[in-house]
Amino acid sequence: MKKSLQLSFTFLIISIILSQGMMADAQKKNCPRKIPIKGSYCAPTICLDKCKKQHGTVGSCAEEKGFCNCACK
């Protein structure tokens, strides 16, 4: 009985770890969100405002000109 309980507990732990890894991978694919901005100049205040309005999160200027990166919730 002790071995079957240990085996069940081990299986439960492994399945939890695998499911957490898959959820983290799915979240990475959606982050960061890019929002286009008018013009090529990016001001941090513009990105903060746009990201807060559209996604309810914070944002910063992207490396590409004309885009803001919004963080995930």
From Swiss-Prot:
Pollen specific. It comes from the Eukaryota. This is Protein BP4C. It comes from Brassica napus (Rape). The gene is BP4C.
